[in-house]
Curated annotation (Swiss-Prot):
The keyword Methyltransferase applies. Glycosylated. Phosphorylated. In vitro, is phosphorylated by multiple mycobacterial kinases (PknA, PknB, PknD, PknH, PknJ and PknL) and by mammalian kinases. InterPro entries: DNA_methylase_N6_adenine_CS, RNA_MeTrfase_RsmD, SAM-dependent_MTases_sf. It is found in: Secreted; Host cytoplasm; Host nucleus; Host nucleus, Host nucleolus. This is RNA/DNA methyltransferase Rv2966c. Residues 17-24 are annotated as: Linker. GO terms for molecular function: methyltransferase activity; nucleic acid binding. CDD domains: AdoMet_MTases (cd02440). It is an enzyme of class 2 (transferase). PANTHER family: METHYLTRANSFERASE. Forms a two-domain structure with a short hairpin domain at the N-terminus and a large C-terminal domain with the S-adenosylmethionine-MT fold. The N-terminal domain helps target recognition and is important for binding RNA and DNA substrates. The C-terminal residues dictate the nuclear localization. Keywords: Host cytoplasm, Host nucleus, Methyltransferase, rRNA processing, S-adenosyl-L-methionine, Secreted, Transferase, Virulence.
Length: 188
């Protein structure tokens, strides 16, 4: 079990998948949201939670005022845990899409998001994450001002952000590194 840190569901516990996932620690999640909310008010934002795992990042965003979160998770057991967590918390605005992150991002959208949260398994190659970041921009997921946060192991190669993103200072918490960037201009 882990818990929601802040907002209307703050302090409530949520389930985590039984094996094969590495939920973001409370400390890292709290720091992540402190960094983002120092620059952006979450109220009313549209959020994309990639490699959602337990859904903790997206649920934290909903608890703190985001209008909507699209959770993307390929593992069926993890997706079932996300669905149960959404129901247990009773937060509106949650949509769960079961499927591979690369396929969902490649399919595109006509509704860009304001915040992208990505916590890929540490064994996902940095080049694959780089490709996802590039596809977000070319497939309509981002707009000027979109913020992206990617959680990686400190042992993983740093990300190569596509043109049009301004990196924010990265943060390191033990063996976890947060890489953040802001979209400078609309999709091309």
């Amino acid at each position: 079990m882990t818990r929601i840190i802040g907002g209307v569901a703050g302090g409530r516990r949520i389930a985590v998948p039984p094996r094969g996932t590495r939920p973001t620690t409370d400390r890292v999640r709290e720091s992540l949201f402190n960094i983002v909310t120092a620059r952006r008010d979450l109220t009313g934002l549209a959020v994309l939670d990639l490699y959602a795992g337990s859904g903790a990042l997206g649920l934290e965003a909903l608890s703190r005022g985001a209008a909507s979160v699209l959770f993307v998770e390929s593992d069926q057991r993890s997706a079932a845990v996300i669905a149960r967590n959404i129901e247990a918390l009773g937060l509106s605005g949650a949509t769960l899409r079961r499927g591979a992150v690369a396929a969902v991002v490649a399919a595109g959208t006509t509704s860009p998001v304001d915040l992208v949260l990505a916590d890929p398994p540490y064994n996902v190659d940095s080049a694959d994450v780089d490709a996802i970041l590039a596809a977000l921009g070319t497939n309509g997921w981002t707009r000027e001002g979109t913020v992206a946060v990617v959680e990686r192991a400190t042992t993983c190669a740093p990300l190569t952000w596509p043109e049009g993103w301004r990196r924010w200072p990265q943060r390191v918490y033990g063996d976890t590194r947060l890489e953040l960037a802001e979209r400078l201009f609309a999709n091309v």
